[in-house]
């Protein structure tokens, strides 16, 4: 075969490969599109499992056998025919497993690590059931249908954000006027705190030498600070939030509940903890909060511990394994949540965090990976 013939042969092979790739992409797209048509089924079925306490019914069943459909429908007072369909879907999604009973005469359901994370009664640092229930309230779902309006609106902000457009006020004002939603926000934040604070604490040892007081800004129920003072018992903790939140905060050992507004001032302390607060605000407000944090801590040992997501700068080129890819996907979903539910909030890249921290006067900071959706950003007063 001459070099010219070889070149033509290789070109034909390359063209055939390209055609196959196009066909493969088309075939994949013809299936993938359906998850955007019916994607709401995932969250609706998960909410159904939480509402009926299906994971608890399986976990608490007196028999060591898999729980049959008849037993499960009796335990949760559900229609067997409808429950069978819900469970078929959730088994297919990997939330539950269906396996044969020991005698092999029937099949039954068992929990998985994922289904146990849908237990509304569990407060073990794994369940995110309160978060699912909060995000699936009609009040939080409705703004998603207005997402395109804010994307297409002028930069000057003449079009109200999705939540404001639906409810006539921002999410914080709405929560203040509707205690049920405020309670759901607080419980959603608390269940995430139970999950992530142990990871944060594991990355904090050595940071609190000489620290005797710490304020949790936007601390909600106070549970986060309660966990931190248990981990670092020499620290006096202050749970700082708006009056209507502090009014229903827990009374915990080593924690004092203090009402106030982070936009006005923050109680003086050695260190500040602020988790999932700054992403609720645009750069201008974020810088103001950070400046108030900086003013509240002393020059020598003062530090601000920020627990927030850090979005990768280079998209998938930064992703090294499946877990990293899934974590990044959650961070990007959170950014969509901020667009739907807050007026100016957003998730930030490291470059964007660098900007707001330096604008607030923090010349030095570090980012510690805690193998989670969130990272620990430590900003030093000096």
Swiss-Prot record:
Consequence of gene disruption: Altered circadian dynamics of stomatal aperture. Promoted seed germination. Increased susceptibility to Botrytis cinerea.
InterPro entries, alphabetized: COMT-like, O_MeTrfase_dom, Plant_O-MeTrfase_dimerisation, SAM-dependent_MTases_sf, WH-like_DNA-bd_sf, WH_DNA-bd_sf
Record Gene3D superfamilies: Vaccinia Virus protein VP39, Winged helix-like DNA-binding domain superfamily/Winged helix DNA-binding domain
Induction: Expressed following a circadian rhythm with the highest level 4 hours into the light and the lowest level at the end of the night. Induced by cadmium. Induced by osmotic stress.
Residues annotated as catalytic: 279 (proton acceptor), 308, 347
Pfam families: Dimerisation (PF08100), Methyltransf_2 (PF00891)
Metabolic or biological pathway, per its Swiss-Prot or TrEMBL entry: Aromatic compound metabolism; melatonin biosynthesis; melatonin from serotonin: step 1/2
EC main group: transferase
The entry's keywords: Cytoplasm, Melatonin biosynthesis, Methyltransferase, S-adenosyl-L-methionine, Transferase
Enzyme Commission (EC) number: 2.1.1.4
Domain of life according to the entry: Eukaryota
A GO molecular function held by the record: acetylserotonin O-methyltransferase activity
Record-listed S-adenosyl-L-homocysteine binding positions: 218, 241, 261-262, 275
Location of this chain's protein in the cell: Cytoplasm
Main location: cytoplasm
Catalytic reaction annotation: N-acetylserotonin + S-adenosyl-L-methionine = melatonin + S-adenosyl-L-homocysteine + H(+)
Family to which this protein belongs: Belongs to the class I-like SAM-binding methyltransferase superfamily. Cation-independent O-methyltransferase family.
Known role: Methyltransferase which catalyzes the transfer of a methyl group onto N-acetylserotonin, producing melatonin (N-acetyl-5-methoxytryptamine). Does not seem to possess caffeate O-methyltransferase activity. Implicated in melatonin-dependent circadian dynamics of stomatal aperture to minimize night water loss and promote drought tolerance. Prevents seed germination by promoting melatonin biosynthesis. Promotes melatonin-triggered defense responses to the necrotrophic fungus Botrytis cinerea. (Microbial infection) Promotes melatonin-triggered defense responses to the necrotrophic fungus Botrytis cinerea.
Protein name, per record: Acetylserotonin O-methyltransferase
Organism listed in the record: Arabidopsis thaliana (Mouse-ear cress)
């Amino acid at each position: 075969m001459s070099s010219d013939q070889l070149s033509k042969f290789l070109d034909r092979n390359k063209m055939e490969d390209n055609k196959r790739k196009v066909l493969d992409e088309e075939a994949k797209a013809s299936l993938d599109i359906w998850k955007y048509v019916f994607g709401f089924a995932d969250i609706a079925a998960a909410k159904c499992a939480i509402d009926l306490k299906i994971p608890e019914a399986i976990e608490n069943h007196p028999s060591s056998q898999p729980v049959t459909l008849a037993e499960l429908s009796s335990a949760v007072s559900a229609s067997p025919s409808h429950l069978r369909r819900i469970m078929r879907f959730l088994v297919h999604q990997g939330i539950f497993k269906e396996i044969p009973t020991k005698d092999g005469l029937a099949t039954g359901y068992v929990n998985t690590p994922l289904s146990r994370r849908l237990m509304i009664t569990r407060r073990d640092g794994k369940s995110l059931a309160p978060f699912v229930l909060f995000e699936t309230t009609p009040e939080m779902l409705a703004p998603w249908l207005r997402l395109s309006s804010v994307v297409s609106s002028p930069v000057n902000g003449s079009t109200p954000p999705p939540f404001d457009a639906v409810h006539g006020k921002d999410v914080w004002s709405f929560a203040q006027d509707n205690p049920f939603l405020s309670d759901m926000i607080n419980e959603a934040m608390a269940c995430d705190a139970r999950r992530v604070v142990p990871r944060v604490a594991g990355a904090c040892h050595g940071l609190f030498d000489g620290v005797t007081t710490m304020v949790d800004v936007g601390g909600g129920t106070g549970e986060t600070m309660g966990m931190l003072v248990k981990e670092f018992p020499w620290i006096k903790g202050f749970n700082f939030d708006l009056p209507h939140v502090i009014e229903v905060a827990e009374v915990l050992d080593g924690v004092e509940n203090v009402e106030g507004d982070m936009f006005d001032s923050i109680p003086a302390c050695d260190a500040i903890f602020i988790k999932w607060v700054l992403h609720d605000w645009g750069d201008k407000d974020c810088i103001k909060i950070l400046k108030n944090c900086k003013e509240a801590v002393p020059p020598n040992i003062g530090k601000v511990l920020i627990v927030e997501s850090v979005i990768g700068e280079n998209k998938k080129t930064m992703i090294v394994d499946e877990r990293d890819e899934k974590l990044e996907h959650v961070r990007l979903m959170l950014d969509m949540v901020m667009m739907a539910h807050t007026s100016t909030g957003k998730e930030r890249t490291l470059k964007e965090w660098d900007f707001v921290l330096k604008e607030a006067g923090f010349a030095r900071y570090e980012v510690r990976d805690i193998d989670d959706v969130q990272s620990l950003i430590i900003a030093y007063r000096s």
